[in-house]
Amino acid sequence: MEYQYPMNEDWTTEEAVDVIAFFQQVELAYEKGADREELLKAYRRFKEIVPGKAEEKKLCGEFEEQSTYSPYRTVKQARESDHAKIKM
């Protein structure tokens, strides 16, 4: 599937790479299963870069619209689960 990750032009290269890493963890959860700790670690880093709820909703909404994968539901399941692997 071809699509672009949502970006903010104010991010540094490192921040952009870390945001993409979070979205890739979400993809992995849907496609093969993601390691719960890695997913939550990527989400925590994402929240350091995108602390506001409004921007988070905007970026995650754009990602879900293009990919059909829900970052919100993925993180929610990871938080509520005690399984080592998260599969959506």
From Swiss-Prot:
Family from the record: Belongs to the UPF0223 family.
Name the UniProt record assigns to this protein: UPF0223 protein YktA
Organism the protein comes from: Bacillus subtilis (strain 168)
Gene expressing this chain: yktA
